[in-house]
Amino acid sequence: MAINPLKILFVASEVEGLVKTGGLADVARALPLYLAQKGHDVRIMLPFYKTIKRRDEAKLLVSRWLPTHPGLPDIGYRIYQMDLEGVCVYLLDCPQYFDRPQLYAENNQAYPDNGERFAFLAAAALHASEQLAFAPDIVHCNDWHTGLLPLLLKTRHAHNPFFQHTRSVISIHNAAFQGVFERQQFWAVPEIADYEQRISYDYGHVNLLKCGVLYADKINAVSPNYASELLTHLGAHGMASIFQQRAADLRGILNGCDYQDWDPAFDDFLPATYDVDNLAGKHICKQSLQQETGLPVVDLPIYGMVCRLTEQKGVHLLLPVLDKFLHHKVQVVIVGSGDPSLAAQLQTLAQQFPDRLAFINTYDDRLAHLVEAGADFFLMPSLFEPCGLNQMYSLAYGTLPLVRAVGGLKDTVVDWDADPEQATGFCFNDPTANILLDAMRRSLLYYLQDPEQFARVQRNAMNTRFNWPDSVTQYEQMYQDALARH
């Protein structure tokens, strides 16, 4: 069903192509792009960080002062504009908050004024929208960084004719990060005082994600299964009761996959391309992966893993059993950086098994693509995974994902045993090292004993698609439901 074009203000802390630390940035680029292709007037708003790419393309529009509180200083800022693949991007320039080497932290230490910084983003986004005469139908917020926006629409701007018809939605990309800060950081948002008890984390602290969830008109998680998990104590990171209060307004919408960048038939990073009808290029990619990572070029199954080295990604589940698995005739390639202690353990194992394990302690786009193409299996033993993108890439590249059945992983991977006809990979449930090892051994057994079925599952995987236009249709419905609220 076609809907009338909407004006959408999409506020995010990062956008792929300009500045990125994680998966939020991928969505913040793709979703506005595909919404615009449907005819909606989408404007992205984000901070003008020091690290923004293509800074010289930004055009200064206006300089303004953000009102704060009687007796307290207003905050000066400037609004810049640039284009991102045909979508208008507004950059909020306030050097005292955003002229820093990184986005959120330096040397693994969060900036102590992050609450104040992103309170400014929320207040300035609405102020700037009014200064630019862009009256949005929908303000689309993303994660804790924008959690104050829905509250400000219902307080500061409740009787502002400019926002009379504006409704807000918030997307939950990762509820583990909630934006909890001391109350005094929000001096520029006096409205918090009347709502502090409701949006507090504990005495004297404010929870920005909680604020967004309580006051947005509609809420979505980035996969249906993750939306269900947010209603449980195991999956909501202490916010189950808050999500339960808003259960009627919560839905799960699976992220799409950007097949323009992740398609083995047109991947410029690969030494050879391939598709579902001709996998010869995948074999060349496998040999290239072995050569580049220093592994012997032999005919063994390769298990790949590309991730941040964190507990969330399940690296601590893999480490206790990796040496046992490496005694099988396999090779493992792990690419990523993060926790130094996890990296040190992987480095030690790589030295013990130089012909079986390659560990590359950095992230590199080209190598990430080569792992997806050259491996036979892709490991994602995540403790939680709101949506996940690498399993989608793996499916497209015919590299069977081996995942823990949580969040979006459960929505996107069909287990070999659970449904042999529709299978696209391997799933396991319990977050223990031995259960993970069992799943890895099961995948190895099937690879060796049933190559015909392996080829069928590989074809199933490569024919699976998670297209953004399908997701956009669901977002459009959520916007309509939000606008229907009075």
UniProtKB/Swiss-Prot annotation:
It catalyses: [(1->4)-alpha-D-glucosyl](n) + ADP-alpha-D-glucose = [(1->4)-alpha-D-glucosyl](n+1) + ADP + H(+). Pathway: Glycan biosynthesis; glycogen biosynthesis. One of its GO terms (molecular function) is alpha-1,4-glucan glucosyltransferase (ADP-glucose donor) activity. The keyword Transferase applies. Coiled coil: none annotated. It comes from the Bacteria. GO terms for cellular component: cytosol. The keyword Glycosyltransferase applies. Synthesizes alpha-1,4-glucan chains using ADP-glucose. Belongs to the glycosyltransferase 1 family. Bacterial/plant glycogen synthase subfamily. PANTHER family: ALPHA AMYLASE DOMAIN-CONTAINING PROTEIN, GRANULE-BOUND STARCH SYNTHASE 1, CHLOROPLASTIC/AMYLOPLASTIC. This is Glycogen synthase. It comes from Aeromonas hydrophila subsp. hydrophila (strain ATCC 7966 / DSM 30187 / BCRC 13018 / CCUG 14551 / JCM 1027 / KCTC 2358 / NCIMB 9240 / NCTC 8049).
